[in-house]
């Protein structure tokens, strides 16, 4: 990853590997997986949760509008023919691109704001969206209007673009 000092990358790998050993065992078993900053590791779904979600929905096309580290998207993609991962943070997109390839997944990665991508996207069978539940100071939020993206603001557009929202 460009512009990140090697010692920071090494520290992230060590911390990420420890967290993944418990939370994402199949990722931990893949020696080429690259890990993000600790907060992204702590906030991502566990492998077991992501596998459970993947049993609940299936279809032709899936769009994950809040990709994050890509754990949910990775496992959900097993139930879809075409999967698109959308994430606003460039570094997470770089990691997802690398990690999906390392895991043999064919997932289209898009670096964009959820709202911008949603505006112009083709309809999908399923839209997966897991909004951030922290404010800009890192505090937890509980109201839908305080999540990012604000589901109340984009709810109608989401319903126009998919058969199922999860």
What are these regions (language model features)?
Residues 1-166:
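SAM-dependent transferase fold signal centered on methyltransferase-like domains
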């Amino acid at each position: 990853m460009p512009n990140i000092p090697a010692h920071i990358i090494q520290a992230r790998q060590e911390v990420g590997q420890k967290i993944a050993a418990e939370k994402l065992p199949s990722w931990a078993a893949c020696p080429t997986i690259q890990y993000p900053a600790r907060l992204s590791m702590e906030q991502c779904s566990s492998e077991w949760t992501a596998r459970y979600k993947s049993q609940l929905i299936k279809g032709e096309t899936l769009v994950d509008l809040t990709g994050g580290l890509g754990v949910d998207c990775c496992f959900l993609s097993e139930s879809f023919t075409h999967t698109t991962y959308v994430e606003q943070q460039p570094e997470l997109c770089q990691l997802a691109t690398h990690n999906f390839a390392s895991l043999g997944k064919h997932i289209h990665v898009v670096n964009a704001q959820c709202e911008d991508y949603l505006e112009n996207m083709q309809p999908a069978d399923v839209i997966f969206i897991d909004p951030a539940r922290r404010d800009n100071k890192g505090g937890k939020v509980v109201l839908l209007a305080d999540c990012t993206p604000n589901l109340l603001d984009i709810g109608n557009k989401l319903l126009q673009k998919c058969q199922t929202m999860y």
